[in-house]
């Protein structure tokens, strides 16, 4: 009996060692490149593509870290979670300074900077008006609000009612406005994931969160093939690329009026609202892509420039040295306009190859003749 127990113990030890070895071999197993992580977050999707050589264990650890970065942003900036830091800020007493996390202060500061530079074309307090037009979480039918309803909601917005103290890392609301960071939080999450991958020593990757992109290194290390991104034709239906551009060590965010809208009596109402009027935009500028080292900045600027339209948008791009590409409706075709910073960054050869028009004084004159 004693010999039987000893044999059983030995068998158990052998079995346990076998399990441990199997676990080790699985973690050490090299994966085919590229490795992709995909899923849903912030009401949209994410796709992270890694080209560096990885084992299964390394990939598992990276995926866990990526999810933690995105969860941190959601915890800080979601307006759909009762436990988020932003919801607590919106519920805090008026005129009282609230200590906030570094990342929430950073995103509030970016938002304020773009709001001031665009003279209010970007405003994180527009949430109540977005809801009124049926594009927010508030359950409303898709209909045009009355003048009285719009006036009432417009009285509740204005970034001047949010003070941000970047020295003491605090902010406060001076009026009962509702701060909504959905126009920049996604870009901030893209930056966070990229920074995490940099920290972990990953050299070749593409981060895509809801269409906000950051590329590093190559998509094919051996051939040194750069990442290439498509700038969509700004129309509903199956996505189609108007231009394909190599993206190296840069991020891009695109804003457009063509995906999210509703129609009433044949008239289309875009989800992109002008915070200065409270109404959907009505001009021929269909999309703006902003290329910037930070996707949060690109996200905010893309929205602001799309709101103001072609001529004002290009003027802002020139004043702020922004690297942007616009797609403008001209009848049945699309006119592609590039800012001076875009031309300087990507070069004349690409401009000529893609048939993109550099913005000049004559471009402005033509725009005035054809109208927005």
Would you name each region that the model predicts?
Residues 2-7, 12, 21-372:
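Mature catalytic core of soluble alpha/beta enzymes
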């Amino acid at each position: 009996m004693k010999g039987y127990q000893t044999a059983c113990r030995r068998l158990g030890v052998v079995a346990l060692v076998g399990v441990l070895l199997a676990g080790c071999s699985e973690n050490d197993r090299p994966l085919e490149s590229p490795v992709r992580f995909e899923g849903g977050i912030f009401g949209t999707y994410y796709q992270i593509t890694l080209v560096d050589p990885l084992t299964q264990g390394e990939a598992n650890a990276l995926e866990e870290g990526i999810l933690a970065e995105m969860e941190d942003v959601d915890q800080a900036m979601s307006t759909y979670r009762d436990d988020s830091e932003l919801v607590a800020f919106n519920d805090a007493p008026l005129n009282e300074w609230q200590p906030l996390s570094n990342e929430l202060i950073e995103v509030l500061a970016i938002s304020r900077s773009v709001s001031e530079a665009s003279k209010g074309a970007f405003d994180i307090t527009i949430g109540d008006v977005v809801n009124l037009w049926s594009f927010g979480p508030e359950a409303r039918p898709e209909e045009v609000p009355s003048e009285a309803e719009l006036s009432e909601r417009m009285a509740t917005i204005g970034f001047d009612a949010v003070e941000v103290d970047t020295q003491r890392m605090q902010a406060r609301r001076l009026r009962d406005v509702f701060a909504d960071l959905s126009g920049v939080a996604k870009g901030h999450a893209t930056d966070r994931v990229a920074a995490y991958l940099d920290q972990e020593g990953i050299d070749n990757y593409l981060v895509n969160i809801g269409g906000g992109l950051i590329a590093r290194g190559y998509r094919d290390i051996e051939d040194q093939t750069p990442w290439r991104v498509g700038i969509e034709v700004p129309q509903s239906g199956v996505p189609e690329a108007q231009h394909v551009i190599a993206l190296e060590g840069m991020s891009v965010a695109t804003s457009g009026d063509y995906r999210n809208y509703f129609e009433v009596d044949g008239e289309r109402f875009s989800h992109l609202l002008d915070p200065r009027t409270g109404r959907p935009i009505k001009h021929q500028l269909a999309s703006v892509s902003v290329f910037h080292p930070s996707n949060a900045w690109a996200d905010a600027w893309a929205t602001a420039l799309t709101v103001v339209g072609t001529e004002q948008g290009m003027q802002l791009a020139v004043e702020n040295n922004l690297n942007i590409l616009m797609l403008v409706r001209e009848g049945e075709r699309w006119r592609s306009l590039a800012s001076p910073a875009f031309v300087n960054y990507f070069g004349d050869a690409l401009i000529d190859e893609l048939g993109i028009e550099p913005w000049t004084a004559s471009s402005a004159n033509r725009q005035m003749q054809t109208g927005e």
